[in-house]
């Protein structure tokens, strides 16, 4: 386990030097030290400016009433050591260069910690419930579900690696009109297979997967099910389709700690319990219209949004039960129970999140599609109304996935909306069949969540270096190949490698060696930022950059005989140790992304 990441170590050293300068009276009119988190350490865009830098002196110029350069020089005078080289640059940057011993010790840490290198302890440990995918059990999972699966499962691994306690959950949307419609659609398909001239219901499910289910029913049961109620067909379809979703997700390396049925909320009385909790807190009221409608506050746009909920729930002029969502920033209050006594979808969502908090989770993270964006304010309001901070509920909104493939006739990239095999929307199963799990996950993870993924099928299928996942896996396999060949050529893999020369210099002197070493040392920070910022895509970029460094190192720095037989054995072994460390960090990074670190290609 890495106690502190590299940037955290540097920030601590800078803060200590800052405190020493303050105690020595060298920081002008500064009356108290700033908080530790105010010390920012970043990588300069220009390598000549050092390995890392901090602009902290510039942020202190106003309270110190000193020039940033003078502040930087005061801090730097207490910061320089054998392990860190320090220089001050205008207008007040403190540039840091890692010393030979510092680099050698960190590389040895990688070799000793192996797969635990970069595993950290958060400053504020939390128990997190991560909910994602949560599809209706009414059909195969589409590409959007695949994106949430890749993102959620990677984020779970990354958060756990960063020291958080994380459970994952799939919310099964198995209560509502769609389940009745699913059962009716399957029953009609069943009757059609038996030769009856019946039509699918309006708005029914028309996918070929239901026809296949119906054909299987006829094969297993013959014509004996015609008298069964729609509910029987609903339950059968749900069971089969949910099981297929589980198989698909498992193949896509996505597992859940719990599958939570929406229907169970109704059966266990959770909805009434949650509403009773809100009512006891004064968060509900009964009225024919919301407070905003009564006062005329609702604008034309807002009224249009609210009307289907508000008026529909009145049922002939009775009083509905409203949640005071507007008290917490939502644009209006929301109906949770209609005048006829039936609860709304929002009531079930309130109960589900109430139950999450009841189970002791301090932070809830939901991954939703862009079509749920408007639902965020009311759920944030729910969290606050239940007595929790607004930021205890994080809702990550993701954009759609578009699939492109070259048309062999025109040579142009064209968007694929339908699966050629099934004549339906492309599913996660189709994606796995086309490009495999590794490429599928990589390309779905490689973009920011709020960016549409333009998935290039041709590129994902390519076994050339222009395919980023192939390139990264190839360079991991290249490291494995070197490590397999080394003992055969008289260089056994050691438990400990010596990276320092007797005079204190570093054996790894070339630009390619230093670049690769520093990239490895950045891994704990990359993992930490990916966890804190909820950005798994950061690790795809890191893995690609690391693979590029491996390629440059391999090209310019021979390791094994006969190419390296004229080099000093100590240099060859230092390079071999660097390969061992590189393979480990690449493997860890790919594993966190749910991608196989392949040992051969």
From Swiss-Prot:
Record keyword Acyltransferase present: no
Gene3D superfamilies attached to this UniProt entry: Arginyl tRNA synthetase N-terminal domain, HUPs, Isoleucyl-tRNA Synthetase, Domain 1
Class of the enzyme per the UniProt entry, highest EC level: ligase
Motif 'HIGH' region in this chain: 135-145
Family: Belongs to the class-I aminoacyl-tRNA synthetase family.
Record-level GO BP terms: arginyl-tRNA aminoacylation
GO terms, molecular function: arginine-tRNA ligase activity; ATP binding
Subunit structure comment from the entry: Monomer.
Any single Gene Ontology cellular-component annotation: cytoplasm
Domain of life of the native organism: Bacteria
Protein name: Arginine--tRNA ligase
EC numbers: 6.1.1.19
Keyword annotations from UniProtKB, A to Z: Aminoacyl-tRNA synthetase, ATP-binding, Cytoplasm, Ligase, Nucleotide-binding, Protein biosynthesis
Localization terms from the record: Cytoplasm
Catalytic activity: tRNA(Arg) + L-arginine + ATP = L-arginyl-tRNA(Arg) + AMP + diphosphate
PANTHER family xref list: ARGININE--TRNA LIGASE, CYTOPLASMIC, ARGINYL-TRNA SYNTHETASE
Gene: argS
Pfam family of the protein (one): DALR_1
CDD domains: ArgRS_core
Organism: Gloeobacter violaceus (strain ATCC 29082 / PCC 7421)
InterPro entries in UniProt: aa-tRNA-synth_I_CS (IPR001412), Arg-tRNA-ligase (IPR001278), Arg-tRNA-synth_N (IPR005148), Arg-tRNA-synth_N_sf (IPR036695), ArgRS_core (IPR035684), DALR_anticod-bd (IPR008909), Rossmann-like_a/b/a_fold (IPR014729), tRNAsynth_Ia_anticodon-bd (IPR009080)
């Amino acid at each position: 386990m890495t106690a502190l990441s590299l940037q955290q170590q540097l920030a601590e050293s800078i803060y200590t030097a800052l405190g020493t300068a303050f105690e020595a009276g060298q920081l002008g009119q500064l009356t108290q030290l700033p908080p530790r988190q105010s010390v920012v350490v970043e990588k300069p865009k220009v390598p000549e400016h050092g390995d890392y830098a901090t602009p902290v002196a510039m942020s202190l110029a106003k309270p110190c009433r000193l020039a940033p350069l003078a502040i930087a020089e005061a801090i730097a005078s207490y910061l320089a050591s054998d392990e860190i080289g320090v220089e001050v640059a205008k207008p007040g940057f403190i540039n840091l260069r890692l010393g030979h011993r510092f680099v050698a010790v960190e590389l040895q840490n990688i070799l000793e910690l192996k797969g635990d290198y970069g595993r950290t302890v958060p400053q504020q440990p939390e128990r997190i419930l991560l909910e994602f995918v949560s599809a209706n059990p009414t059909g195969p999972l589409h590409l959007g579900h695949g994106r949430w699966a890749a993102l959620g499962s990677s984020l779970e691994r990354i958060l756990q690696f960063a020291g958080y306690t994380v459970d994952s959950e799939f919310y099964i949307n198995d209560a509502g009109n769609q389940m009745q419609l699913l059962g009716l659609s399957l029953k009609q398909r069943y009757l059609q297979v038996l030769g009856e001239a019946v039509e699918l219901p309006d708005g029914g499910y028309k996918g070929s997967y239901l026809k296949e289910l119906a054909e299987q029913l006829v094969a297993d049961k013959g014509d004996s099910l015609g008298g069964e109620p729609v509910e029987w067909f609903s339950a059968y379809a749900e069971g089969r389709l949910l099981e297929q979703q589980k198989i698909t997700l498992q193949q896509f390396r996505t597992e859940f700690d719990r599958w939570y049925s929406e229907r169970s909320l109704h059966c266990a009385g959770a909805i009434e319990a949650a509403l009773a909790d809100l009512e006891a807190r004064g968060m509900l009221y009964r009225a024919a219209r919301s407070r905003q409608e009564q006062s005329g506050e609702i604008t034309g746009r807002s009224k249009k949004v609210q009307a289907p909920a508000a008026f529909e729930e009145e049922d002939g002029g009775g009083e509905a039960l409203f949640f005071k969502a507007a008290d917490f920033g939502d644009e209006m209050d929301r109906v949770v129970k209609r005048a006829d006594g039936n609860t709304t979808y929002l009531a079930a969502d309130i109960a589900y999140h109430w139950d999450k908090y009841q189970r002791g989770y301090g932070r809830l993270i939901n991954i939703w599609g862009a079509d749920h964006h408007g639902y965020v304010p009311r759920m944030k309001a729910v969290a606050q109304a239940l007595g929790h901070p607004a930021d205890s509920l994080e809702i990550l909104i993701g954009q759609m996935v578009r699939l492109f493939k070259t048309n062999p006739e025109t040579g142009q990239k064209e968007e694929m909306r339908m699966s050629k095999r099934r004549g339906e929307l492309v599913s996660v199963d189709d994606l796995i069949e086309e490009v495999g799990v590794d490429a599928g996950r990589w390309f779905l993870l490689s973009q920011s969540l709020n960016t549409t993924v333009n998935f290039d099928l041709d590129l994902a299928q390519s076994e050339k270096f222009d395919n980023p996942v192939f390139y990264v896996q190839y360079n991991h396999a290249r490291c494995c190949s070197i490590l397999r060949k080394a003992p055969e050529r008289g260089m056994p893999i050691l438990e400990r490698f010596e990276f320092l020369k007797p005079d204190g210099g570093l054996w790894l002197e070339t630009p390619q060696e230093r670049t690769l070493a520093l990239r490895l040392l950045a891994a704990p920070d990359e993992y930490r930022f990916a966890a804190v910022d909820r950005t798994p895509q950061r690790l795809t970029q890191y893995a690609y950059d690391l693979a590029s460094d491996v390629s440059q190192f391999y090209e310019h720095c021979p390791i094994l005989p006969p190419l390296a037989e004229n080099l000093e054995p100590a240099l060859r072994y230092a390079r071999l140790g660097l390969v061992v460390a590189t393979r480990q960090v690449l493997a860890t990074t790919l594993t966190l992304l749910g991608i196989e670190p392949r040992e051969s290609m």
